Amino acid sequence: MSPQTETKASVGFKAGVKDYKLTYYTPDYVTKDTDILAAFRVSPQPGVPPEEAG
């Protein structure tokens, strides 16, 4: 039988939905030579903002 360990859910992760602009969008990002450009066509479901669909 393996020893039990204590897990704290509040360390490093909080459940919930965050605004896309606050978590992923970085307007001042400077591209590098090693960056890869990929393009995808996304169609949001009714009631979902386009920026949240991707």
Swiss-Prot record:
Transmembrane segments: none annotated. One of its GO terms (cellular component) is chloroplast. It is an enzyme of class 4 (lyase). Residues 1-2 form a propeptide. InterPro entries: RuBisCO (IPR033966), RuBisCO_lsu_fd_N (IPR017443), RuBisCO_lsu_N_sf (IPR036422). Disulfide bonds: none annotated. The modification N-acetylproline is found at P3. GO terms for biological process: photorespiration; reductive pentose-phosphate cycle. The modification N6,N6,N6-trimethyllysine is found at K14. The keyword Plastid applies. Pfam families: RuBisCO_large_N. It catalyses: 2 (2R)-3-phosphoglycerate + 2 H(+) = D-ribulose 1,5-bisphosphate + CO2 + H2O; D-ribulose 1,5-bisphosphate + O2 = 2-phosphoglycolate + (2R)-3-phosphoglycerate + 2 H(+). Keywords: Acetylation, Calvin cycle, Carbon dioxide fixation, Chloroplast, Lyase, Methylation, Monooxygenase, Oxidoreductase, Photorespiration, Photosynthesis, Plastid. GO terms for molecular function: monooxygenase activity; ribulose-bisphosphate carboxylase activity. Its EC number is 4.1.1.39. It is found in: Plastid, Chloroplast. The keyword Aminoacyl-tRNA synthetase does not apply. RuBisCO catalyzes two reactions: the carboxylation of D-ribulose 1,5-bisphosphate, the primary event in carbon dioxide fixation, as well as the oxidative fragmentation of the pentose substrate in the photorespiration process. Both reactions occur simultaneously and in competition at the same active site. The basic functional RuBisCO is composed of a large chain homodimer in a 'head-to-tail' conformation. In form I RuBisCO this homodimer is arranged in a barrel-like tetramer with the small subunits forming a tetrameric 'cap' on each end of the 'barrel'. Heterohexadecamer of 8 large chains and 8 small chains. Belongs to the RuBisCO large chain family. Type I subfamily. This is Ribulose bisphosphate carboxylase large chain. It comes from Ilex aquifolium (English holly).
